[in-house]
Amino acid sequence: MLIIVESPTKARKIQSILGVKTLSTIGHFKDLPDSQIGVDLQTYEPTFVYHEKKQHLPEELRKAAKGETVMLAGDPDREGYAISCHIYEEVKSVAKACLRMEIFEVTEKGLKESMTKAVPFEQTNAGLYHAFLGRRIGDRLVGYILSPIASRSLRNKYSVGRVQSPAVRLVVDREREIRNFTASLYWLLNIQLTKDGTSFLAYHVKGKFEAQADAAALISRIASETHATARKVEKKETRQAAKPPFTTVDLQAAAAARLKFTPELTMKLAQGLFDHGLITYHRTDSVRMDEAFIAEIRTFLAQSVGAAYLPAKPNQHKSKNSQAEAHEGIRPTHMHATAECAERIAREQLTPEHVRLYELIFLRAVASQMAPARYDSTLLLFDVAGESFKATGRVLKFDGFLKVYAEGEEDKEKDKDGKGSEEKLQTLPALTVGEQVVKERESLEEKKTKPPGRFT
C-alpha cells in the first residue's frame, strides 16, 4: 500500500502511525503555465504543466505506485481533491488500484476510519475538480487579461484578481462611506437612583433625543422631584448557552479578536496543528462533534470541574449548512489536562503561536459541552413626574461554560440603544411595585452617531 498526501509533515506523521509508506507532493505539482494564458478562450479548456522544480515528481510517484493499492489522500477540500486528481492521472496506469482517502484527523483512530471508508477514485465526486477548475481558470482569465489593461490605463503596474479586485471595491466603497459620513448629535436622558447604598442608572424609555431642547425640557420637568416610583418589577433567570466548536470563519474571528492573529496566520498555524495530528481538519462549516469525543470531554469535565458543569445530556450543536454535517467542527484530537496544551505542542517542535491557537481551540471545544451560564436578570420601570425610565441589570448566578471559555469581544452583541454594556451589567436592588427610591440627580449624555466600521 502507498499513501500520497500534500504535506511532508503529514506524510511523516502518517507513516509513523500506520507504518505504511507515505509520500507527499508538497502541494500542487501541476498548474497553468506562467509564460502564457494556458486556457483555450473558445472552449475554456486548461493546459496544465508541471512545476519547474517538480518535473521529477510524476516519475517518482509512478515508480512508487507500481503494483500498489494507492490511497490518494489530499486534503478533504477542493484543492486537495484537485491534487489527488492530478496524482490519479499519473499513477492509474501502473497502480493496482487507486482509492480516495479523506483524512479529517491524523490519529491512529482517524486514519484507520479513513482507510475503511476509502472508495475507488473513479466513484468520487468529480464536481470538486470542476469547482477547482472554475476557480483556477477564473483566476487566470481575470488576472491575465485585465492586469495589463489596468496597468496601461493607470500608468503603473497593477494586478487585477478574481477575488482581490471585488474585495478592494468593497473596501473602497466602505471607506468612502466613512469619509463622507457626517456625525449628528443626540442625547440620552438618565437619572441616578439609590436604595440601601446601591446606586444605579435608569434611562428615559424614549431612548435617543435628537433635539437637545426636548431633553432639556424634560430635565426641567423632573429636576424638582426627589424620588422615583417603581411601576414595574420584572425578574427572571436567563441563560447563555455554550457556543459550538469552531468553524473556520469563527476560528479566524476569535483568533483575530483574542490573539491578534491575521486570518492568514491563523490558517497557517491551524494547518501545522492538523498536519501534526493535534486538531481535526480546519477548513469546515460544521459544528458537529464525534460522539465518542463528546463522551471524553464529559468525563474530563466531571473529573476537573465537577458534575454541576455538565448538562444532563450532551449539547447538540447544529450546523447552518446541513451538507456540512458529514464533517466535524474544529477540535483537538485527544483529551488531556488543560495544563498539558503547551507540552503537547512542544513535543511536536511547534511554536508559541501554535500553543496559543491550540489552547483556544481546546478550550472552545471543551466549553461547547458545558452547562449554560445563568443570570438573574431584572427590568425596572420608574415614574418620575409622569415620565418613564427603565433600568436593566444582570447578575451572574452560575458561570457554567464561562468558567472555561470567557466571553470575548467577538461574542458580544452591541447595544441597540447606544447605552453600552454598563447598564446591562449593573447590579440592581430588590424592589417592589409602588416603592419609592431616592433620585440623586438627572443628566444628559451627549452622543454622536458613528460611521460604519471598517471591515475586519
Residue spans for each PLM region:
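Intrinsically disordered, low-complexity regulatory segments
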Residues: 1-136, 140, 145, 424, ...
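Generic beta-strand/beta-sheet core signal
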Residues: 4-6, 25, 73-75, 192-194, ...
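Charged, alpha-helix-enriched surfaces in structured cytosolic catalytic cores
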Residues: 6-9, 13, 52-56, 78-82, ...
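Long, highly charged, low-complexity internal segments
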Residues: 30-50, 158-271, 275, 306-307, ...
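A generic secondary-structure signal for well-formed alpha-helical elements
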Residues: 91-95, 119, 145, 149, ...
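Active-site phosphate-binding and catalytic loops of NTP-dependent enzymes
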Residues: 96-98, 121-127, 146-152, 176-181, ...
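C-terminal or mid-to-C-terminal helical accessory/interaction module adjacent to the motor/catalytic core
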Residues: 106-193, 235-239
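Extended, well-ordered alpha-helical scaffold/bundle regions in very large, multi-domain proteins
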Residues: 261-324, 330
